Amino acid sequence: QPVMMTLPPIDGERYLDFLCRDNLRRDRILDWLGEPQMIYRHQELYADTAAEIALRENIPLIPVRQTFLRNHRLSQLIAADGIHLTMPGYEQLFDTLADWVKKNI
């Protein structure tokens, strides 16, 4: 049986800074995006859509995003590029997946 998971959140501001590190025109990217947090919101919509599909299709869902958002040190779990995880972030991801497997498999 398939299992779905939501993605860990990203930091839109840090990701935009990372994208613009090599003289990319931040102002032009923002003209297209509207604001830096649109990056975060697009990824949030992706996570919400995955959860809706899992519910509709009766597919088990691992709520990775929610466990990250509950962490009061979220910024320490996301790398400087704003999109990848740090080692503590990968540890939290592993723990979340392992806990889910223990409870559901």
Feature annotation, model-predicted:
Residues 4-6:
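Structural beta-sheet core signal
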